[in-house]
Structure formats: C-alpha cells, structure tokens
Amino acid sequence: MLTITRELRDRIVAHARADHPDEACGVVAGPAGTGRPERFVPMLNAARSPTFYEFDSGDLLKLYREMDDLDEEPVVIYHSHTATEAYPSRTDVSYASEPFAHYVLVSTAEGTDEADPYQFRSFRIVDGVITEEDVQVVEAYTA
C-alpha cells in the first residue's frame, strides 16, 4: 500500500494538470528504507509528448546524486496519461527499473467521474509484473 499525504497527492495532480496536454513526470523521494514519500521533485518531460514521457538524463543524474547525498531513495515515480486510463503501458513497464518504488499514474483524460475528476493509482512493477496497490491519503504521517 502507498501511504501519501494529501499535499503530495495534490501536488502530483497539479503537475499533471499543468503539463497537460503533455505527460507530466517526476519523483517523490524519501528517507532510504522508510518507504515514506516526502520530497516532491517535478521533472521536465524531455519528450514533450502527450503519449510518452522521458526524464531528462542530466536532471535524473543530478536527482540521484542529491538523493544519494541526502540518504534518500525514489519512493514514488509518477507520470500522467493524458488520453487513457491510469494504468501502466508496455513502455512504462519496460522503463520500470526501481523494484521498491511505487509507480503512480494520474489520468487527465476527459470523461472521468465528476466526483473524482482524475484517476490517481499506484502500482508495483517488478520484473515486468504489474500489481496494483491501494492508496491511503493522509493529512500527515504518524511517527
């Protein structure tokens, strides 16, 4: 299960909406070994595409160096789908290289439920196997 604060969830969704019609992407880093997403890091979609995302290799290298210096790891790796449901594509699965990360997808496609105008879903992707997991949104983390 992914436990994430409402603030972080809202920031991910806001990034997805702001970059629409292109796919948005980013990382939420957290202290190594805790599984707790804390530091929101929106990234530039180097592909600038409505159907594909790609982290800029220089930005990604910089982020991994920062995380290493801060004893962090990528807890959430997120991106948006602009015209389809929030479910990993074959390309998404092929790029999923962090077996302990939560892969979050947000759909900004039209026609979603009015009560919940976007889909926010989390998956584990290990060795090409996709497993959807529950998302628990909290106001703050407990100790």
Model-derived segments and spans:
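Conserved, mostly hydrophobic/aromatic
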Residues: 77
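Conserved beta-strand-loop surface patch within small alpha/beta domains used
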Residues: 1-74, 83-143
